[in-house]
């Protein structure tokens, strides 16, 4: 049985940046962004909750002190 081994050159590592900077979304110019949403109005939230589940809305009012 005749075996041949091919010698591979040793792997060289190039200079490494000690602090690689991750690209920020503003640098890339594209990509998804977090939507600008404020907290929902509490009265509006309670009205919507009452439509869906009145008992849950009542428990939420008691829990939050509304």
Swiss-Prot record:
UniProt cross-link Isoglutamyl lysine isopeptide (Glu-Lys) (interchain with K-? in acceptor proteins), position: 66
Domain of life per record: Bacteria
InterPro entries: UBact (IPR037543)
Function, as annotated: May function as a protein modifier covalently attached to lysine residues of substrate proteins. This may serve to target the modified proteins for degradation by proteasomes.
Stored Pfam families: UBact
UniProt name for this protein: Prokaryotic ubiquitin-like protein UBact
Annotated transmembrane regions: none
Keyword list, A-Z: Isopeptide bond, Ubl conjugation pathway
Start and end residues of each stretch annotated as Disordered: 1-66
Basic and acidic residues biased stretches: 30-66
Family: Belongs to the ubiquitin-like protein UBact family.
Any one GO molecular function term: protein tag activity
Organism: Nitrospira moscoviensis
